[in-house]
């Protein structure tokens, strides 16, 4: 970030704080609160703090744009591949899965992929929690968003950010008989740097209230292509253009206590294999990271990267639909051959 721009933002933030303090001492608390709660002011304050441009549109217009609607041909979830039975994985399924290592660990992938998964996700109480650490992440073409090659799409509007993607996953899972809690808390606003800490508290709250939860999905989208531009992914679901999916598993490499990280990796391998069986090329390599990203809270935790900033929302929704179908296929667990 350019130091001159950072200094200008800091100066503006100090000026706004001084004016706000002066107004507060003048006894106009309610008008000031209303002013600071305006979407355009919230967006500006986020820019001052992080340098990120966020769409100020937070209230739904009278008529929602067509892009917010899931593709009509995908409105009914496809039946899971093995309904009401455990899936069986073999060593040959490992050929469908790639792993991108950012750590020195080299676990036995065949053993993890073919290991039993003993659970039943179809219960009377919720068994899956969906959260969004970077809730304001959005996609190309969202209304009123400002885009630059070195920037990132962000939106406070739940019809365009990660909440919309989480809603599609939850909708398909619920239709398949799985009870879901979709927490729509915005964890990356106003403080982006506190995002994972905010999400951790949210997850802990739900696990305490619903100890039967055995899968926590932190749904994101990817951003950079590694050379300064916005990444665009390319996959297909039932012959239709879709965003690609990437599952991220954490480890204890960064020094945090996380003894069960291989269980989460095993789940990522299983889901990726199922996705590739149904729609070859839909997934990117499973990524093994050094940080735990709150995955230590339950063995069924994953980060799900649905497409990237350069993809369209409707492509992300189609990929989310396919991901939910793969979860449905694992609803009754997995057995060894």
What is each model feature region?
Residues 1-5:
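N-terminal Lys/Arg-rich, disordered targeting/topogenic segments
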Residues 10-214, 223-229, 321, 334:
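N-terminal catalytic or cofactor-binding beta/alpha core of small enzyme domains
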Residues 129-131, 180-182, 215-218, 246-249, ...:
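Structural recognition of the beta-strand scaffold that forms the well-ordered cores
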Residues 166-170, 200-204, 265-272, 301, ...:
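Extracytoplasmic/secreted envelope proteins and their assembly/folding machinery
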Residues 260-287:
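Active-site-adjacent substrate-binding region
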Residues 281-337:
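Active-site-adjacent mobile loop/cap segments within catalytic or ligand-binding domains
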């Amino acid at each position: 970030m350019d130091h001159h721009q950072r200094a200008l933002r800091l100066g503006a933030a100090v000026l706004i704080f001084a004016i706000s303090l002066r107004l507060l001492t003048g006894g106009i608390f309610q008008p000031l609160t209303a002013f600071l709660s305006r979407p355009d002011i919230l967006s500006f304050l986020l820019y001052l703090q992080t340098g990120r441009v966020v769409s100020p549109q937070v209230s739904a217009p009278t008529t929602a744009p067509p892009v917010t609607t899931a593709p009509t041909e995908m409105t009914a979830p496809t039946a899971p591949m093995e309904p009401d039975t455990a899936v069986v994985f073999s060593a040959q399924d490992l050929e469908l899965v790639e792993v991108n290592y950012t750590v020195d660990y080299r676990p036995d992938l065949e053993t993890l992929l073919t290991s039993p998964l003993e659970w039943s996700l179809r219960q009377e109480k919720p068994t899956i929690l969906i959260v969004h650490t970077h809730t304001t992440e959005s996609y190309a073409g969202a209304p009123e968003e400002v885009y630059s090659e070195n920037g990132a799409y962000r939106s406070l509007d739940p019809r365009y950010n990660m909440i919309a993607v989480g809603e599609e996953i939850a909708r398909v899972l619920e239709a398949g008989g799985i009870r879901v809690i979709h927490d729509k808390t915005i964890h990356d606003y106003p403080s982006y740097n506190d995002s994972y800490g905010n999400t951790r508290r949210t997850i802990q709250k739900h696990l305490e209230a619903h100890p039967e939860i055995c899968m926590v999905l932190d749904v994101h989208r990817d951003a950079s292509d590694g050379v300064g531009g916005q990444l665009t992914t390319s996959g297909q679901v039932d012959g239709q253009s879709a965003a690609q999916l990437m599952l991220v598993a954490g480890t204890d490499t960064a020094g945090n206590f996380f003894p069960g990280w291989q269980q989460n990796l095993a789940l990522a391998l299983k889901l990726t294999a199922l996705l590739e069986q149904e729609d070859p090329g839909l997934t990117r390599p499973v990524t093994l990271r050094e940080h735990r990203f709150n995955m230590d809270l339950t063995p069924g935790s994953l980060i799900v990267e649905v497409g990237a900033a350069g993809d369209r929302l409707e492509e992300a929704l189609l990929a989310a639909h396919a991901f939910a179908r793969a979860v449905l296929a694992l609803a009754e667990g997995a057995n060894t051959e």
